[in-house]
Amino acid sequence: MHPIRKKRLTIVLFLVAGIAIAVGLTTYALRQNINLFYDPTEIAAGNAPVDVRIRAGGMVEEGSVSRDTDSLKVNFRVTDYAASVPVQYEGILPDLFAEGQGVVAMGRLNEQGVFVADQVLAKHDENYMPPEVAEALERSSKGQHKSADVEKAAETTAY
C-alpha cells in the first residue's frame, strides 16, 4: 500500500471512530434525561418502571390531599377517572395546585406502588391541561363522554 493512501486510511478510520464515540456518548447522555409519561391507569396496571424517573399526570382526586402539620410533606392521589395513584411529595406546592385540577408530577414509583414526586407542576389557567393529561383523560372512561374541560384542554396545547 502506498504511504499516502495508508496515511489517508488511518485518518479516515480515526475520524469514523471519533464520530462513533461521540454519537455513543450523546445517545447515552440523552437516555439518562428522558422522562417518560405514564397515566394513573398505566401505573396501576404495573406498566410503569419501578425506581426509574418518570412523569405521572392526571387530576388531583377530590378529598385526597392530606398535609403533614410538622413538615412540608403532602400526600394526594392523581386520577384519570379510571384509576388513581397515591403520590407523596415533600416541598412547596405550586400556587395553582388544588383538588380537581390537572397536575404533572416528576419522580419515581416505589415498590409499594406509591409515586414519590420530587417536582409537581400545576396547570397555569382554567382552560389549559398538559397534552399528555388530556390524552390520558380522553382514553379513560370519563373521557369517552368527552367532557367540555377535556375538549378545551385538547385544543389548548401551548406550554
UniProtKB/Swiss-Prot annotation:
Q: Where is this region: Disordered?
A: 135-159
Cellular component annotations (GO), alphabetically ordered: plasma membrane
Compartments where found: Cell inner membrane
**One GO BP:** cytochrome complex assembly
Judging by the UniProt lineage, the source's domain of life is Bacteria
- Enumerate the InterPro entries for this protein: CcmE, CcmE-like_sf, NA-bd_OB-fold
In the record, what terms sit under GO molecular function? Answer: heme binding; metal ion binding
Q: Does the keyword Heme apply?
A: yes
Q: Give the compositionally biased regions (Basic and acidic residues).
A: 136-159
- Membrane association type: Single-pass type II membrane protein
* Keywords attached to this entry: Cell inner membrane, Cell membrane, Cytochrome c-type biogenesis, Heme, Iron, Membrane, Metal-binding, Signal-anchor, Transmembrane, Transmembrane helix
Q: Which residues lie on this side of the membrane: Cytoplasmic?
A: 1-8
Q: Where are the transmembrane segments?
A: 9-29
Binding of heme: at which residues? Answer: 124, 128
Q: Which residues lie on this side of the membrane: Periplasmic?
A: 30-159
Gene3D superfamilies linked:
Nucleic acid-binding proteins (2.40.50.140)
Protein family? Belongs to the CcmE/CycJ family.
Q: Which HAMAP family match?
A: CcmE
> What is the stated purpose of this protein?
Heme chaperone required for the biogenesis of c-type cytochromes. Transiently binds heme delivered by CcmC and transfers the heme to apo-cytochromes in a process facilitated by CcmF and CcmH.
Cross-referenced PANTHER family, in alphabetical order?
CYTOCHROME C-TYPE BIOGENESIS PROTEIN CCME HOMOLOG, MITOCHONDRIAL
- The molecule here is called Cytochrome c-type biogenesis protein CcmE
Q: Which organism is it from?
A: Marinobacter nauticus (strain ATCC 700491 / DSM 11845 / VT8) (Marinobacter aquaeolei)
